[in-house]
């Protein structure tokens, strides 16, 4: 079962997978390889790794990217896995019947995986704006974000 969780941040998108039947230790082994990488690079790594835990994580990363493109309109080329965490879930306990009426306990561990994708294009635009402000030709008069001509040009604002 995959649940999606949203946060109020404008550049982050969450996807949460709960009760995935895999131990948290085995899932962390895969998650540590993709943390901090771009979306496309993470998908390639997950496709080529030979572990069974890669497939549910692959689906979760793909789902988070689909949330980003559908809900917030982000491009998949600008997405980076900023946060990926694995928490231990419930342990399902079963009894396996054995010879002579005995039984052995079987423990099936689960985990909860959270993937956070972040859009880096916002930060690139912000850095470009800061570089523009640091240019020597840019004086304090040019740094005003609101255009003075918009309010003083007449048009709709002066007519009543």
Curated annotation (Swiss-Prot):
UniProt entry tagged with the keyword Lipoprotein: no
Top-level lineage group: Eukaryota
Protein name in UniProt: Large ribosomal subunit protein uL22c
UniProt record, GO biological process: translation
Similarity section: Belongs to the universal ribosomal protein uL22 family.
Subunit structure: Part of the 50S ribosomal subunit.
Keywords: Chloroplast, Plastid, Ribonucleoprotein, Ribosomal protein, RNA-binding, rRNA-binding
Function: This protein binds specifically to 23S rRNA.
GO cellular component term, pick one: chloroplast stroma
HAMAP family listed in its UniProt record: Ribosomal_uL22_B
Intracellular or extracellular location(s): Plastid, Chloroplast
GO MF: mRNA binding; rRNA binding; structural constituent of ribosome
Pfam family, one: Ribosomal_L22
Source organism (scientific name): Arabidopsis thaliana
């Amino acid at each position: 079962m995959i649940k999606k969780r949203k946060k109020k941040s404008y550049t982050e998108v969450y996807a949460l997978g709960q009760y995935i039947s895999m131990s948290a230790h085995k899932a962390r082994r895969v998650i540590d390889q993709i943390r901090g990488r771009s979306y496309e690079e993470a998908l390639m790594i997950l496709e080529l790794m030979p572990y069974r835990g890669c497939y549910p994580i692959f689906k979760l990363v793909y789902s988070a990217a689909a949330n980003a493109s559908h809900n917030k309109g982000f491009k998949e080329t600008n997405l980076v896995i900023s946060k990926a965490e694995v928490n231990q879930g419930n342990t399902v306990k079963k009894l396996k019947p054995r010879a002579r009426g005995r039984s052995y306990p079987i423990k099936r561990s689960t985990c909860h995986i959270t993937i956070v994708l972040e859009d880096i294009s916002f930060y690139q635009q912000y850095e470009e704006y800061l570089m523009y402000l640091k240019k020597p030709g840019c004086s304090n008069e040019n740094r005003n974000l609101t255009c003075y001509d918009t309010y003083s040009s007449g048009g709709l604002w002066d007519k009543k």
